[in-house]
Regions:
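Acidic, metal-coordinating helix/loop segments flanking the phosphotransfer/catalytic sites
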Residues: 33-51
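Active-site residues of response regulator receiver
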Residues: 55, 83
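The feature encodes the CheY-like receiver
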Residues: 59-62, 87
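Short amphipathic alpha-helix used as the core "switch/output" element in two-component signaling
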Residues: 42, 64-75
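Acidic catalytic/metal-coordinating carboxylates
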Residues: 36, 62-65
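Short, Lys/Arg-enriched segments at the junction into DNA-binding effector domains
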Residues: 5, 118-138
Length: 138
């Protein structure tokens, strides 16, 4: 089973640590964390990331704007937004910014895990998927 690199972006340290702890129980994930949109943007430029989980309310810029910047820079992997605001308008803004999914806090971990796996499966089947064989990336 391939290991998928997930970047978790949230300024709430306790939530970030709890999610990393839960996801680390599964051998299928390699986990990294960031506290801001700026850190996330730099991270996805420097490293291969298979999926980003990104909070909307980040200290340096709105998470949706961070996603927009990542997409403009060519980031193709799935992005799941986390938000405390569940309005339809908020969801539309996130999806239009380039997010693939929207999860409203509080959420059940099992639901987030199922969405992560579904987006990874879908992305692997798409033309945008990146494959590594030894030192080569395709």
């Amino acid at each position: 089973m391939p290991v998928h690199h997930i970047l978790l972006v949230d300024d709430d340290q306790s939530l970030r640590e709890a999610l990393i702890e839960q996801l680390a129980l599964y051998d299928e994930f390699k986990l990294s964390a960031a506290e801001s949109s700026g850190q996330a943007i730099q991270f996805v430029q420097d490293q291969r990331v298979d999926l980003v989980i990104m909070d909307v309310g980040l200290p340096d810029m709105d998470g949706r704007e961070g996603v927009r910047v990542m997409r403009k820079a060519g980031f193709k992997s799935p992005v799941i937004m986390l938000t405390g605001q569940g309005s339809d308008a908020d969801t539309v803004l996130g999806l239009e910014a380039g997010a693939n999914d929207y999860v409203v806090k509080p959420f059940k971990f099992a639901v987030l895990l199922a969405r992560i796996r579904a987006h990874l499966r879908q992305h692997e089947a798409s033309e945008d998927a990146v494959f590594q064989v030894g030192p080569y990336t395709f």
